[in-house]
């Protein structure tokens, strides 16, 4: 197996407190950008996409992988346009998080998009998804019932709801 960083997998050797060493395989990832589109009525746009790893259609926030050196904010705006056919007047950062801290260097950068305007979707040739506007309260209930299983979507919906409930957004 190729372990070069350009292929995404590398070994890390760590000296333990007792003097021994351990080896960890680390996946090197350029990161991702995630966007929470919120319309004037308080609906968020989720996408439904078949995920082969789980053999089912998954509810997700629009998101995508970053290319090497790509600005996360520009990637988030691109995903909003490509996956939802939307642009926005205002973007508010919700920060970043590490989705898989045990073996992966991925950081997901997250924004809320408001002042939405419809444009045209531009899906990749191998991308098949359906956007759907859902009231935030319904998305929250979907998280709580386990209908939304995607980690970035769970984190985004819960953080957005908390910030709105606290009047911080």
What do the predicted segments below correspond to?
Residues 140-169:
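Long hydrophobic alpha-helical segments typical of transmembrane helices together
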Residues 10-11, 57, 107-109:
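Short beta-strand micro-motifs in enzyme catalytic cores
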Residues 21-24, 132:
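Short beta-strand segments
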Residues 1-9, 13:
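Single conserved hydrophobic/aromatic residue that forms the stacking wall/gate
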Residues 33-34, 65-151:
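Unchanged
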Residues 17-19:
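Glycine-centered tight beta-turn/hairpin loop motif at sheet-sheet or coil-to-beta transitions
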Residues 24-27, 33-78, 169:
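Conserved Nudix-box catalytic region and its N-terminal flanking loop in Nudix hydrolases
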Residues 43, 117-119, 167:
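Short helix-loop capping/hinge motifs at secondary-structure junctions, enriched
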């Amino acid at each position: 197996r190729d372990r070069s960083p350009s292929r995404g997998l590398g070994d890390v050797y760590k000296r333990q407190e007792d003097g021994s060493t351990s080896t960890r395989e680390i996946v090197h990832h350029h990161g991702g950008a995630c966007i929470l589109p919120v319309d004037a009525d308080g609906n968020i746009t989720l996408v439904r996409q078949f995920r082969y790893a789980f053999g089912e259609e998954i509810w997700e926030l629009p998101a995508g992988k970053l290319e090497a050196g790509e600005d996360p904010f520009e990637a988030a705006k691109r995903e909003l346009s490509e996956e939802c056919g939307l642009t926005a007047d205002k973007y508010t950062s919700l920060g970043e998080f590490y989705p898989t801290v045990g073996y992966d260097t991925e950081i997901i950068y997250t924004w809320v998009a408001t002042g939405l305007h419809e444009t045209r979707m531009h899906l990749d040739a191998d991308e098949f998804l359906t956007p759907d506007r859902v009231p935030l309260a319904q998305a929250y209930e979907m998280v709580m019932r386990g209908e939304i299983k995607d980690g970035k979507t769970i984190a985004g919906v819960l953080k957005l709801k908390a910030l709105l409930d606290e009047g911080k957004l």
